[in-house]
């Protein structure tokens, strides 16, 4: 089952606070993604882009633009529970 995201909030240091429908809250650190995935480097180099994180219409993906998205199952699995 693909987890649905209730809300996403960009934080400092390229971290996201994500709340899932079933009540789990996690902090997901994008530092490694920015370092390892070419498209994600725009989150660091384009001023203000990281703060524009939003949910797609299915609420199963955080998106920034047409090239950068992050699936909810990745966030759910690798995010740190808070």
Question: Where are the regions that the model predicts?
Answer:
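Motif-centric detector for short Cys/His coordination patterns
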Residues: 1-82
């Amino acid at each position: 089952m693909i987890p649905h995201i209730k809300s996403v909030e960009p934080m400092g240091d390229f971290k996201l606070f994500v709340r899932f429908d079933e009540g789990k809250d996690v902090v997901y650190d994008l530092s490694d993604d920015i370092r390892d995935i070419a498209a994600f480097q725009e989150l660091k180099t384009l001023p203000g882009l990281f703060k524009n994180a939003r949910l797609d219409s299915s609420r199963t993906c955080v998106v920034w633009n047409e090239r950068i998205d992050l699936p909810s199952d990745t966030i759910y699995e690798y995010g740190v529970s808070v």
